Amino acid sequence: MAQADIALIGLAVMGQNLILNMNDHGFVVCAFNRTVSKVDDFLANEAKGTKVLGAHSLEEMVSKLKKPRRIILLVKAGQAVDNFIEKLVPLLDIGDIIIDGGNSEYRDTMRRCRDLKDKGILFVGSGVSGGEDGARYGPSLMPGGNKEAWPHIKAIFQGIAAKVGTGEPCCDWVGDDGAGHFVKMVHNGIEYGDMQLICEAYHLMKDVLGLGHKEMAKAFEEWNKTELDSFLIEITASILKFQDADGKHLLPKIRDSAGQKGTGKWTAISALEYGVPVTLIGEAVFARCLSSLKDERIQASKKLKGPQNIPFEGDKKSFLEDIRKALYASKIISYAQGFMLLRQAATEFGWTLNYGGIALMWRGGCIIRSVFLGKIKDAFDRNPGLQNLLLDDFFKSAVENCQDSWRRAISTGVQAGIPMPCFTTALSFYDGYRHAMLPANLIQAQRDYFGAHTYELLAKPGQFIHTNWTGHGGSVSSSSYNA
């Protein structure tokens, strides 16, 4: 007998927690896992005493679902998703819904939407953020795909999502085909940027100011009462205070080689593909790559010299405020770049994205949740067509207020030999963006010189000219060089 509102396939911790979250909100869920013994274990333990149902086969699972059938896949991205879709399609009817809640590549989601539409199945690719805790008590959800599915899943998705303000859910329809997974990808890229910016602030505190863990933890706790109020700042303070079983701080014992699952890399690759200067996320990815060269760095540290270590002689409290403002200004740049990429993707794929709504989706439940995102929503509410966050009066004033501190923090760090790839690229982007004239005219002249690629004159836009720079050779454009 059909009695379940929705099914979920994939009983790793995220899947289990999403099921329990849906159960808490009054939805009857049918659980399935490829290893069916996991279903029995889940029902006997974590889901004991709940209304959660189990199934030992896909056929049994489908038979227990009310129509239109709603099925969430929470399995490893890639072939596993396609394999389950292939098995499910023969069991489903026209109008049934498959939802991929994994970290799928947005192009895969676009393909699946297209293929399943031809079969009459509604496909949704939804970003899910917030980790295991978010899944259990309120994630940020970013659904996109076939919009016909939205009325049938809206109550469930908005019911289980994190809530902010006066109970607004951190979930709304994002857009067509791959839009939900694209937005989740950019979210993850921004997360890389936020984490690296915090690391650079920590590095300046530790190696320029010489602060101890208690002092650094206190600084981050204070910062969490300012514009920087966020989940990542909050946990950084906790990490800095945490002591191991021997009573010593744990952080210095952790190997300084950062891992990555690839979603930050996807964001950087997309930025290159669509010609958007998302420099900060790119540098955050490369910083992790550099950190992974631990053995090489140990050897290099014995051979390569930097500036002499001179104790900081300035006002520590004042420089700490410079670091805070540098972090805030750089964070603004990171989000401005992220939303530039979203805007370009919307143009490329014909998506209608609600940028203020996206900021609200990220306002709670996810790893980058922060008060700051409310300001981004306000900016897009004031001007839905806003070209760049930096052009909004609030963010323009915020960066201006931070600018002197930003430059001082970076110049002091450079003089001390501290690597700050994200602080420095953020400032370089800001300076580049505010320059009406950049030296790219020389690049165009060079390209024309060696490859006859032509150039435009400021006085004659739209007319492409080739100059015979050496007096030798013809004036025909060449395709021999593509620099």
Swiss-Prot record:
**Pathway where it operates:** Carbohydrate degradation; pentose phosphate pathway; D-ribulose 5-phosphate from D-glucose 6-phosphate (oxidative stage): step 3/3
Task: Please provide, in alphabetical order, the Gene Ontology terms of the cellular component aspect for this entry.
Answer: cytoplasm
Q: Which GO terms describe its molecular function?
A: NADP binding; phosphogluconate dehydrogenase (decarboxylating) activity
What lineage, starting at the top, does this entry show?
A: Eukaryota, Metazoa, Chordata, Craniata, Vertebrata
Q: Which SMART domains match?
A: 6PGD (SM01350)
Which residues are named in the active-site annotation? K184, E191
GO BP term (any one): pentose-phosphate shunt
- Cysteine disulfide partners in this protein: none
Q: Which residues form a coiled coil?
A: none
Among NCBIfam families, the record links this protein to: gnd, PRK09287.1
Q: Which reaction does it catalyse?
A: 6-phospho-D-gluconate + NADP(+) = D-ribulose 5-phosphate + CO2 + NADPH
- EC number assigned by the record: 1.1.1.44
Q: How does it assemble?
A: Homodimer.
| Functional description taken from the UniProt entry | Catalyzes the oxidative decarboxylation of 6-phosphogluconate to ribulose 5-phosphate and CO(2), with concomitant reduction of NADP to NADPH.
Q: Which residues bind NADP(+)?
A: 10-15, 33-35, 75-77, 103, 478-481
Classify the source by domain of life: Eukaryota
**Which Pfam families does the record associate with it?**
6PGD (PF00393), NAD_binding_2 (PF03446)
Binding sites annotated in the UniProt record for substrate: N103, S129, G131, H187, N188, Y192, K261, R288, R447, H453
Record-linked Gene3D superfamilies: 6-Phosphogluconate Dehydrogenase, domain 3, N-(1-d-carboxylethyl)-l-norvaline Dehydrogenase, domain 2, NAD(P)-binding Rossmann-like Domain
Q: Where in the cell is it found?
A: Cytoplasm
Residues bearing N6-acetyllysine are K38
* Keywords in alphabetical order: Acetylation, Cytoplasm, Gluconate utilization, NADP, Oxidoreductase, Pentose shunt, Phosphoprotein
Q: Which family does it belong to?
A: Belongs to the 6-phosphogluconate dehydrogenase family.
- The protein in question is named 6-phosphogluconate dehydrogenase, decarboxylating
PTM Phosphoserine: list the residues.
Answer: S57, S129
